[in-house]
Amino acid sequence: MALKSPAFRKKFPLLVTGSLLALQPLATSFVVAAEQYDCSVSASGGWACAPKTSAAQLPPRPVHDANSVSSSVATAADATGEEASGDKSKLVTEAKGRGLKSRSADYSHLDWVPREKLTAAQLAETGPYCSGSYIEPIRPGMNDKTNKSDAPTFIGAKASRYQQEEQVATLAGDVVMRQGSMQVEADEASLYQAENRGELSGNVRVRDNGALLVGDHADIQLDTGEAKVDNAEYVLHKSRVRGNALYAKRAENAIIRLKDGTYTTCEPNSNAWQLKGNNITLNPATGFGTATNVTLRVKDIPVLYTPYIYFPIDDRRQSGFLPPSFSTGSDTGFMLVTPYYFNLAPNYDATLYPRYMAKRGLLMEGEFRYLTKSSEGQFGAAYLNDDDTDRKKQTDYEKTRYMLNWQHKGGLDSRLMTEVDYTKISDPYYFQDLQTDQIGVKATDYVNQQGVVTYRGDDYTARLNVQAYELASVANITPYNKLPQITFNGALPYHPQGLDFTYETELVRFDRDLLTGNYTDKDGGPIDPVTGAVGTRRLDTNVAGLARANGDRLNLKPGVSLPLNWSYGYLTPSLKYMYTQYNLDLDGTGKEGIVAARNYATATGTRYVGGDYSRNQNRGVPIASLDGGLYFDRNTQWFGKNYRQTLEPRAFYLYVPEEDQKDIPVFDTGEPTFNYASLFRDNRFSGSDRVGDENKLSLGVTSRWIEDNGFQRQRISVGQALYFKDRTVQLPGIDYRTRADATSNVSPYALEYEYRYNRDWRATADYNWDPDSHSARSGSAMFHYQPEDNPNKVVNAGYRYRNDQIRYDQNSGTWKMGGDYGTPGQPGYVKDYYKIQQHDFSVIWPIVPQWNAISRWQYDYNRNRTLEAFGGFEYDNCCWKLRLISRYWVKYDEFSQNAPENEKGDRGIFLQIVLKGLGGVMGTKVESFLDKGIQGYREREDQAF
């Protein structure tokens, strides 16, 4: 039955009893009434009942089972006897953290649905190791958002009786009361009009907004919806949270309070872990809970106590402590992190990370995040008064350690964009000694200090960039800063005769302050036995000649091209002109270095390949190219499957005249390693300080196998360049006559290959073969397997080889080819230090249900050493996860300026325990090296629930 409630909600009991009188005949044959009544809502909001003028023929009585309510003495006595003779309902405390099986063997009383009975949509939302899920049954009003004071009330039962003098309504048999989204179910109910309350007994269920309370007996306040359920169990469906309590109270605002209660995300038949507290409060409105005098129990055994805990019950944000983590390490000793989250507003928040380290003290770190309609970003800071003294004798070490960070992206409008990436650290050893929890802060050799303003027009882009770097290493030379850099690039909006006109403009100031003096290591040395000098020269003192210059650079690069496109191919002639003007400053040390290098070359009879200093330098170089390709395709079959196979030959001719550039310093230029894409670049250098002279014809061909649905099964590209002159323009210090690849008539053969067996696994390879030396110049082969429908399986295998690096040598201050560190015969020299010849294998694979093997092995064949190896296992179920991994790795910790001396092997055994619903208890570092070391690990975790 359904009646619209009067506007005043406190008349709810009268509404119930009146509805019973008005709409339901008396239930039992032994109830005798002298009069029948017609009842309706009065003008005052109460009920007006009047005797019927005539006793009409009543409809037949419904037949009810033995559970129907009765007032006969005999029936009541029989019922009492049956109850006394039957088994009493078990207490929830007897279940020891599991669901109460006496209520239902399959835990259906908790809305538990086994995995085999879940629908496809429900399975997609259920973790792979969960044997089922809590599914709230569909019921009328479950999504009703109407205020309860305005919502109609529904009452149903198999039998009912009303005692008018006592103003008590008694319901029996499948009792259901519903108002708005709240629904109460029981075997029997007594509603007391005078006291505005009800008593329910037998299989009591209280449902509201995705929460379920189950108990043996309940008291409910009819005018507010407050309820107390004895011997209670509860479920929060979406959060997969359940528990029990001596009794549970539901407040009018739907907050649930538990006396001597438990909290867990484990399945009903599991007591793997639970929180047990004297008083537990769950607030579905905020998504968080609190508990006092709490013990964390594993298999009902207490393992941890806390007087207070604040924990999430869903994924919403709320201020409070986050799960703590603790670990041990040689640099920190015992470490405990107790993060606290501040939910300040919907669009900004903050997190404080107090990090106690037994060897170093208390590191206070925090971050503030913000989000507006036009911007997003974060501020971060960290501070430590370091108690550790291992580095106190090292140069640049600071006892007061700190880090500041600001990251920002925003737009003043749709065209004007701003970006900031600024990090400052107290000393170059900060990231080697200390961890950071700030999002986006990367531990590299340099920290970025950059601010950018970009304006995007219809046909152009203007950009102002101010960028500096701070060293986070003592084994590198101080880099150049751009203070500032202004670029203006675009294309003309008109295209006469199909011509495209483009332009690139840059004005930038390069500046750096090179460090002077000596560097002392962790022992305060070394001490020269002859001179008594302490320490070694800083690496910055190795920078000599033009490499010490600062200056301004103006670069202009207009271009014109004529793209011609047809269905069968394309042809694009292009002409560019690159003009660069320099205004340089060189200190006395740099000028003296140029003179000394010239004198040394003269004395030894060698060729001087360095440059001469002139304050004003300029260079103008035309760049002409002709790029063309054809497109052929055909329908074919491969292993019985239809494909469209393409054949795409390409020819690229490039002519750039030789221009002497040795008097120009290198500010931001390098030479990328050779690959297939190198064949079709118009400058073999990156940056603007060098324009490579070229007279070459590059030939390449690509073939693809494409399925009818557009899926590219396979792609292969192969090509080679034919050179018609030597490449004389080189980076400073390199003589083209000593480079075999600069005087060769042909480039290496370049090959790229990709094969996808399906969307689950793929293989990629690249290979560069030098026909002059009949040897591989570089190459790699990678295999990756991870099924879309089961990302828990991950296999990676790869091999890399490279020995054609062009790099800046920190020890000599010059550009060099090859992989050697330092100079032969000099201290610290290591042959083939930078040469790459490695294999990398990693796997995550299920062994048996819920058990996975995890392993990685990265080996360096060049130096016959293992770079990293770890192996272990993972146990994962619906409510907790454990990983135990043994790991060996090469650790880099700077106690010297010579990079090879800072490498040493380290070992560790890592344990990670994750209680789902509470977070990681220990072992957060495990996440870090698994994420970095195993491709596909992050995708696996994101999809594994």
Swiss-Prot record:
Location of the protein in the cell: Cell outer membrane
InterPro entries hit by this protein: LipoPS_assembly_LptD, LptD, LptD_C, OstA-like_N
Predominant location: membrane
Superkingdom of source: Bacteria
Signal peptide: 1-33
Any one annotated GO CC term: transporter complex
Keywords annotated in UniProt: Cell outer membrane, Membrane, Signal
Region (Disordered): 56-98
Compositionally biased tracts (Basic and acidic residues): 85-98
Gene Ontology biological process terms from the UniProt entry: Gram-negative-bacterium-type cell outer membrane assembly; lipopolysaccharide transport
Key word Hydrolase present: no
One Pfam family matching this protein: LptD
Function description: Together with LptE, is involved in the assembly of lipopolysaccharide (LPS) at the surface of the outer membrane.
Subunit-level organization: Component of the lipopolysaccharide transport and assembly complex. Interacts with LptE and LptA.
Protein name: LPS-assembly protein LptD
